[in-house]
Amino acid sequence: LLWQDNKIVTGFTLADNRLTVRTNGQRGNALVAVYDAGGTILWSWHIWCLPNDRPQDDRYTNRAGEQFLVMDRNLGAIGTDLKTRYGLVYTWGRKDPFTSNEVYNAAGRKDRFINHWPTIYTSNGSEAKTYDLTYMTRHPTTYVYTGWYAKLYTYYDNALWGDPAPVDTCLLYTSP
């Protein structure tokens, strides 16, 4: 068990190359994994439980008259109302979700899901610029980012957006 958001997982069975996850019948999400003898994650699965509340298809029609079916909630959402429809967060190229909510760790204690933002280095000590599928599979709870784009959103600076106004003032904008 890597994390769960509602203590839904009650047990596991690993037999005949098959992982069985038992849940308590409540709504929620979990991320479970299998490891090798050395503790390296071999694969992980997102468990999404929605007893008695299966997602429905909503029909949408675009301006050209084409119809599309869209699930009535985001992947990982436990409901469709304002408080429960958000769901989980996926980053490009990753199969496993991230959550911004508090979760329960493997020890059963409340924890923040993403609790480290590591910089990955290559074997010669330089910062790694690419991450392969093997790394992502073995580190499903590690948020990987590089370069200026990621730092743009994680770096706090009041002048970030280039506002030329002095601190504690604002520019008035008017229409011509």
Task: Report the location of each language-model feature.
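Low-complexity "stalk/linker" and mucin-like segments enriched in Ser/Thr/Pro/Ala/Gly
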Residues: 1-16
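Long, low-complexity, polar/charged, intrinsically disordered or flexibly structured peripheral segments
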Residues: 2, 116-170
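Extracellular/luminal low-complexity segments enriched in Ser/Thr/Pro
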Residues: 16-27
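A short beta-strand micro-motif common to beta-rich folds, especially ectodomain repeats
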Residues: 28-36
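GGW-centered surface loops in extracellular recognition modules
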Residues: 40-88
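Carboxylate/His-rich catalytic cores and anion/metal-binding grooves
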Residues: 105
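Conserved small/polar residues in nucleotide/adenosyl-binding loops
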Residues: 173-174
